[in-house]
From Swiss-Prot:
The lineage of its organism: Bacteria, Pseudomonadati, Pseudomonadota, Betaproteobacteria, Burkholderiales. Homodimer. GO terms for molecular function: haloacetate dehalogenase activity; monoacylglycerol lipase activity. The gene is fac-dex. Signal peptide: none annotated. It holds the Pfam family Abhydrolase_1. Changing R105A: Abolishes enzyme activity. Changing Y212A: Abolishes enzyme activity. Optimum pH is 8.5-9.5. Keywords: Hydrolase. Changing Y147A: Abolishes enzyme activity. This is Fluoroacetate dehalogenase. It comes from Burkholderia sp. Catalyzes the hydrolytic defluorination of fluoroacetate to produce glycolate. Has only very low activity towards chloroacetate and bromoacetate. Changing H149A: Abolishes enzyme activity.
Length: 304
């Protein structure tokens, strides 16, 4: 996987971020979600690398990145901390400004980065998510049943870690295959093996739990403080039409107050449509990124 890409471990302060870098052109950061890692992009990144310098990175707590012990206030696993990690990664690699595509937790990290560091994010694509604040504020019995793991994973340590650790494959495969609206056949075997390596690591189990603990505490508070703020860069809301998120929320309506310059796209499949439809995913991302770049250039010409 990732033939022609360079594997890097980059020190960004208190953690080290694992990434792969390949291609040439404007910088593009691809971020994964739960319960995956950077290998979710293995069949998409090469399709973008002829036009972009593509960086696929593991979030802290996932894959080959550092997995610190969670702090009592959960701040070291907040999306603010994760966004800071990834921004510093890109700056260390030589990119002050870049396009950002994030799936699931990576999309939440991207949304936070676009709020905290708007000068760094040229365009933002959020894949199959709604804002963290809305996920907690608009809970009904259907949302609670579909997203039960949000509440289980944020329980105090070490309870969820021990439950998951007793049989990690059953837990995580239940998430992956259930939300994906498909079985194991919908995933590349090499990618699945990389996910399983992560699932079986107790430090990664702890990291993902800490991620969700932050979601229900500090991330919610930060998002509440930013109600009314809009991301100004070009933005794409991209979902799987057979997924739970798409069926439970009017995604365009939910995102419209938060993204000033938004478009919407969807593909068949569930939450993990990137794995199932890499060619179509890359095509839609290329179209969005091309239009975003054209709009940025037009704005820069008007301002010069």
């Amino acid at each position: 996987m990732f033939e022609g890409f360079e594997r890097r471990l980059v020190d960004v302060g208190d953690v080290t971020i694992n990434c792969v870098v390949g291609g040439s052109g404007p910088a593009l950061l691809l971020l994964h979600g739960f319960p995956q890692n950077l290998h979710m992009w293995a069949r998409v990144a090469p399709l973008l690398a002829n036009e972009y310098t593509v960086v696929c990175a593991d979030l802290r707590g996932y894959g080959g990145s550092s997995k610190p012990v969670g702090a009592p206030d959960h701040a070291n696993y907040s999306f603010r901390a994760m966004a800071s990690d990834q921004r510093e990664l890109m700056r260390t690699l030589g990119f002050e400004r870049f396009h950002l595509v994030g799936h699931d937790r990576g999309g939440r990290t991207g949304h936070r980065m676009a709020l905290d560091h708007p000068d760094s994010v040229l365009s933002l694509a959020v894949l199959d998510i709604i804002p963290t604040y809305v996920m907690f504020e608009e809970v009904d019995r259907f949302v609670a049943r579909a997203y039960w793991h949000w509440y289980f994973l944020q329980q105090p340590a070490p309870y969820p870690e021990k439950v998951i650790g007793a049989d990690p494959d059953t837990f995580y495969e239940g998430c992956l295959f259930g939300w994906g609206a498909t079985g194991a056949d919908g995933f590349d075997p090499e990618q699945l093996e990389e996910y399983r390596k992560q699932w079986r690591d107790p430090a990664a189990i702890h990291g993902s739990c800490c991620d969700y603990r932050a979601g229900g505490t500090i991330d919610f508070e930060l998002d509440h403080g930013d109600l009314g703020r809009q991301v100004q860069c070009p933005a794409l809301v991209f979902s799987g039409s057979a997924g739970l998120m798409h069926s439970l929320f009017e995604m365009q309506v939910v995102w419209a107050p938060r993204l000033a310059n938004m478009r919407f796209a969807s593909l068949p499949g569930g939450h993990f449509f990137v794995d199932r439809f890499p060619d179509d995913t890359a095509r839609i991302l290329r179209e969005f990124l091309s239009d975003a770049r054209s709009g940025i250039h037009q704005t820069e010409r008007r301002e010069s």
